[in-house]
Amino acid sequence: MALQSCCSSSASVPATCSALCLAEATRAASLFVRPRAAARRLVLARCARGREGGESKAVQLVLGGRARDDGSESESSDDEDDDEPMQMTDEQRRTLRRKIREMMDRVPETAEITDPAERKAKMLELLTKYQLVVEEEDPNWPEDDEDGHGFSLGQFFDKITIKAEKKNDDDEEDDAKGNQSDKEIVWEDDNYIKPIRDVKTMDWDDTVFTDFGPLIVLVHNRYKRPQDNENARDQLVKAIEMFWEYNLPSPRCVAVDACAEPDLVKALNVSGFPEVLFTNAGKIVHRDKVVRSAEEWTRMMAFFYYKAARPPCLSEADGQGQEKVPLMS
């Protein structure tokens, strides 16, 4: 009985030991497998993040953005911000391309001459038309008022005529002594004497009171009856030029812009446009508010200033005004 119990106890011990050994081995194996599985999952996660990061960089490069490096989480410098390309929307990109195409369409396409013989012929043609060097005694030199071949100063400016007078012996002696003669060059500047000169408020006193001779004042307005104002100025110009054609002295004539010089117009007591004031010796002798022809105004000037016959357009009371010309200083 005791042996049986011992055997039974001895038989139960190995079973218990084996069970304990197997349990210990299983626990150790599980502890060894878990770190490896965790490490494997960590590696797979890193690979997945690497693939996602690479895909985002490619997408950013395609869209025009700047791919961010792995260690670029820190603050970037101002230089890097300046180098960053400008991000544009699709609408802005289409607008920019359309403007570029419009600018390119404005420039006409020119065909380039590639044939050497044709290029040489074209060069010879240009040299023939526009010579680089011309002899002073060339019989074909143009005698008209031109600056070179084919370009005239009259296209851009009024003609300038300069007349050089011959010097006398006395003038040459003065030049030798260092005294310059006043008659070396005579300017024929009739082309620069305008029949009507525009005057401003700041120049009014010098224009009127420096010379008390005959003066005609045209007060015009570019916005009120513009056609009549322009016609009045044209007829006055023709009237003054008629004096010049007969080598007669013409009265001075100035124009006042009502839009630019309202204070002067108010001082002259002008309300309707155009209006022509005939002044003499600092007094307004007549106000004419009618747009007349050049011939009628010529006769009026001759009557007021040169004691000519009275024209039919004037009454006996006209020309007797004593209103003083205003002073603007």
Curated annotation (Swiss-Prot):
Main location group: plastid
Superkingdom assignment: Eukaryota
Gene Ontology, cellular component aspect: chloroplast stroma
Biased composition range(s): Acidic residues: 72-85
Transmembrane segments: none
Keywords, sorted A to Z: Chloroplast, Plastid, Transit peptide
Compartmental location: Plastid, Chloroplast stroma
Signal sequence bounds: none
Residue range of the transit peptide in the UniProt record, numbered on this chain: 1-46
Annotated segments matching region Disordered: 58-91
Record's keyword annotation contains Plastid: yes
GO biological process, one term: chloroplast organization
InterPro entries: MRL7/MRL7L (IPR044701)
Annotated function: Plays an essential role in early steps of chloroplast development. Involved in the regulation of plastid gene expression. Required for the proper function of the plastid transcriptional machinery and protein accumulation in thylakoid membranes. May function as molecular chaperone to ensure proper organization of the nucleoids in chloroplasts.
Listed name of the protein: Thioredoxin-like fold domain-containing protein MRL7L homolog, chloroplastic
Organism from which the protein derives: Oryza sativa subsp. japonica
Gene: MRL7L
